[in-house]
């Protein structure tokens, strides 16, 4: 039976969006680029198969799911696995399948803690387990201008990969000499220009996702601030401690004036 985890998703040891995607991709040998892609439920099903072999009917999981009713079917399989292993967590299927960042990010933060509490370190070949299937991306989760080619995962005979339970890595695209390969036969540089444009598109998507993550956490902090303000006159030491943390700044940090820095930003 599974070890249940009841901690909330708002803790200091949470992984960032990039670290979470890196953990998922390395553990399952996938190429997810957005947290929203977890809305299909397929990755969770395979993680359950990794943790508790036989708890999930993995052959019934639709890794190529692109429609909402297919996502729901995958989550039904996940729910059955939860029930079989005694997992108490209620899956908010109706929210997850909509593909919104906040709902999916909160759930995967909980799932990471659940995974860490139950993973025993055994080897697992994710590609062989899903018979070489790759996850599809719904059209609504892809930017119209993006046409990034799928990265090869290597041969099917690759050695089983051991998932990373706690290691933090970064999944941000790396810009370096190795990313641009100039074709000696192309004198006009069209291939190089196209690849550079592709890198720009990927970086723009990364910035958009980081802004979503920033707004997500800012919203939570704002809600906490409002609660503190509503109870400001109660002289609660715990409440005061929370307020102190909310308004604390790093040593040497100076809040910029509204007048001067604007010109500098425009010049930059």
UniProtKB/Swiss-Prot annotation:
List of residues that carry N-acetylalanine: 2
Family: Belongs to the MAPRE family.
Record function comment: Plus-end tracking protein (+TIP) that binds to the plus-end of microtubules and regulates the dynamics of the microtubule cytoskeleton. Recruits other +TIP proteins to microtubules by binding to a conserved Ser-X-Leu-Pro (SXLP) motif in their polypeptide chains. Promotes cytoplasmic microtubule nucleation and elongation. Involved in mitotic spindle positioning by stabilizing microtubules and promoting dynamic connection between astral microtubules and the cortex during mitotic chromosome segregation.
Record region (Interaction with MTUS2/TIP150): 124-268
Chain spans, region Disordered: 146-191
Domain EB1 C-terminal: 185-255
Protein name (record): Microtubule-associated protein RP/EB family member 1
Residue list for modification N6-acetyllysine: 220
GO CC terms: cell projection; cell projection membrane; centrosome; ciliary basal body; cortical microtubule cytoskeleton; cytoplasmic microtubule; focal adhesion; Golgi apparatus
Region (Interaction with SKA1): 232-255
Chain ranges of the Calponin-homology (CH) domain: 14-116
Span list, region APC-binding: 220-242
Highest taxon of the lineage: Eukaryota
GO BP annotations, alphabetical order: attachment of mitotic spindle microtubules to kinetochore; cell division; cell migration; establishment of mitotic spindle orientation; microtubule bundle formation; microtubule polymerization; negative regulation of microtubule polymerization; non-motile cilium assembly
Quaternary data: Homodimer. Heterodimer with MAPRE3. Interacts with DCTN1, DCTN2, TERF1 and dynein intermediate chain. Interaction with DIAPH1 and DIAPH2. Interacts (via C-terminal residues 206-211) with APC (via C-terminal residues 2674-2845); the interaction inhibits association with and bundling of F-actin. Interacts with CLASP2, DST, KIF2C and STIM1; probably required for their targeting to the growing microtubule plus ends. Interacts with MTUS2; interaction is direct and probably targets MTUS2 to microtubules.
CDD domains assigned: CH_SF
Keywords, comma-separated and alphabetical: Acetylation, Cell cycle, Cell division, Cytoplasm, Cytoskeleton, Golgi apparatus, Microtubule, Mitosis, Phosphoprotein
Species of the source: Rattus norvegicus
Molecular function, one GO term: microtubule plus-end binding
Main localisation: cytoplasm
Sequence segments annotated as region (Interaction with APC): 206-211
């Amino acid at each position: 039976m599974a070890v249940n985890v009841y901690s909330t998703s708002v803790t200091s040891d949470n992984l960032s969006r990039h670290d979470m995607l890196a953990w998922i991709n390395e553990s399952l040998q996938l190429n997810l680029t957005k947290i929203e892609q977890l809305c299909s439920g397929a990755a969770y099903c395979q993680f359950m198969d990794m943790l508790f072999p036989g708890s999930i009917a993995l052959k019934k999981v639709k890794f190529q799911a692109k429609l909402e009713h297919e996502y729901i079917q995958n989550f039904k399989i996940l729910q059955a696995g939860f029930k079989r292993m005694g997992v108490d967590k209620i899956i908010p299927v109706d929210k997850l399948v909509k593909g919104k960042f906040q709902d999916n990010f909160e759930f995967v933060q909980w799932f990471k803690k659940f995974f860490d509490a139950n993973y025993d370190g055994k080897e697992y070949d994710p590609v062989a387990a899903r018979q070489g299937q790759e996850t599809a991306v719904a059209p609504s989760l892809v930017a119209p201008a993006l046409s990034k080619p799928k990265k090869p995962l290597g041969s099917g005979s690759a050695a089983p990969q051991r998932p990373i339970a706690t290691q933090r890595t970064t999944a941000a695209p790396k810009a370096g000499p190795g990313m641009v390969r100039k074709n000696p036969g192309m004198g006009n540089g069209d291939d190089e220009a196209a690849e550079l444009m592709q890198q720009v598109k990927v970086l723009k998507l990364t910035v958009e996702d980081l802004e979503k993550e920033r707004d997500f956490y800012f919203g939570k902090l704002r809600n906490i601030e409002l609660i503190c303000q509503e109870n400001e006159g109660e002289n609660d030491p715990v409440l005061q401690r929370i307020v102190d943390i909310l308004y604390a700044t790093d040593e040497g940090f100076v809040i910029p004036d509204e007048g001067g820095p604007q010109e500098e930003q425009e010049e930059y």
